């Protein structure tokens, strides 16, 4: 058997389908928790759930918000939503998980940042908020150096998921050599938790880019 999971995302139907698949394939317990982390009420509900789960071993902050518009032309509040999802939610959920982890002197937190954290060319708000996730992770690990808790900033590059399509980005012309599968990125991230390196950039192409 594997590790029991609490799955958080906006779409209940997708969550329930994923939970059923994971339960059947790996014989793990799954709980779905539909929430939009850009909404205060939902974010606070997730934080309470985390705080009420003292046996939590691993928190993965992987909620993403993509955008490609120019900052000075943003009239839809995309910048505010990006800050809410990448900065505010990451901070609040990490704090919610830490109390129990500190008491047990064990646990791990993976903040999914991006190679965009190293680049000024990936959009003003996207690069900036991803840079926050990177620096937050690095400084937090320093703060927790003797706590038994590991903090990782995972900085993937182009990864085959729905993210780019949902963000309205057509990257079909980008050669396959620049892409990685989500499974490959996950394997590298979890393997890295055996050590103590905070910033993890998966893939040789991505390492060159940073």
Predicted features by range, described:
Residues 62-67:
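Conserved NAD(P)H cofactor-binding loop of Rossmann-fold oxidoreductase domains
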Residues 24-39:
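Rossmann-fold cofactor-recognition segment
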Residues 114:
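Residue(s) in the substrate-gating loop at a strand-loop-helix junction
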Residues 3-17:
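Conserved glycine-rich Rossmann-like NAD(P)H-binding loop of the short-chain dehydrogenase/reductase
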Residues 70-83:
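Substrate-binding pocket helix/loop in short-chain dehydrogenase/reductase
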Residues 141-205:
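SDR active-site lid
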Residues 94, 129:
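Active-site helix of classical SDR
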